[in-house]
Regions:
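FAD-site-proximal beta/loop scaffold in flavoenzymes
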Residues: 42
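Acidic/polar alpha-helix N-cap and adjacent early helical turns
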Residues: 162-181
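Short gly/Ser/Thr-rich phosphate-binding loop of adenylate-forming enzymes
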Residues: 1
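Phosphate-recognition beta-domain surfaces
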Residues: 11
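AMP-binding/adenylate-forming catalytic core of the ANL superfamily
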Residues: 5, 16-21, 26-27, 32-38, ...
């Protein structure tokens, strides 16, 4: 957020600049505020978060707007989705941040199972435990028949985020599940 170079391994936003100002774009049509955010201090802010390794290779982590902030930790919805989607019973998933009573957000996973497969929410939590940081493991899980999608089949994350915690959400904390740290 401060246009400073990150250390290898740390999370940061991909930003770029050209030796010719505003090459390729003049900003967002009729959106002056969004254009100001895009072009800040001579840098183009992509809105993508990632890490650079020791060899200078870059790795995408998430869209800045879709990253989840939970108890002081930045969580990539993209990375949590990848772990959950690797489970044999899971067809697709979408992970969003929902409001927390402690401030910031809690992690909610909405999951569609493959036809003929069954898995409990606790089994999914136990699947996640050895594969991701404890703070990224979803607190809420909703198993559904489908995810909301655009005509081009992109998941409409904003709809799942807007709905918040719904009646079909299983709550890991209410279930008394203790995570291994």
């Amino acid at each position: 957020d401060d246009d400073q170079e990150c250390q290898p391994g740390s999370l940061g936003e991909f930003i770029a600049r050209s030796n010719k100002m505003f090459v390729g774009t003049t900003g967002y049509y009729n959106k002056p505020e969004a254009t100001l955010e895009l072009f800040s201090n001579g840098w183009i802010h992509t809105g993508d978060l990632g890490r650079m390794d020791e060899d200078g290779h870059f790795f995408f982590v998430d869209r800045k707007k879709q990253a989840i902030r939970r108890r002081g930790e930045n969580i990539s919805s993209f990375e949590v989705e990848a772990v959950i989607a690797a489970h044999d019973a899971v067809l697709e998933t979408c992970v969003v941040g929902v409001p927390s009573e402690l401030g910031e957000e809690e992690v909610k996973a909405v999951i569609v199972l493959k036809e003929g497969h069954k898995v409990s929410e606790e089994e999914l939590i136990r699947w996640c435990e050895p594969r991701m940081a404890y703070f990224a493991i979803p607190r809420y899980i909703a198993i559904r028949d489908s995810l909301p999608k655009t005509p081009s089949e992109r998941v409409e994350k904003f709809k799942l985020k807007q709905e918040g915690i719904t009646e079909d959400c299983w709550d890991r904390e209410e279930a008394g599940i203790q995570l291994q740290r």
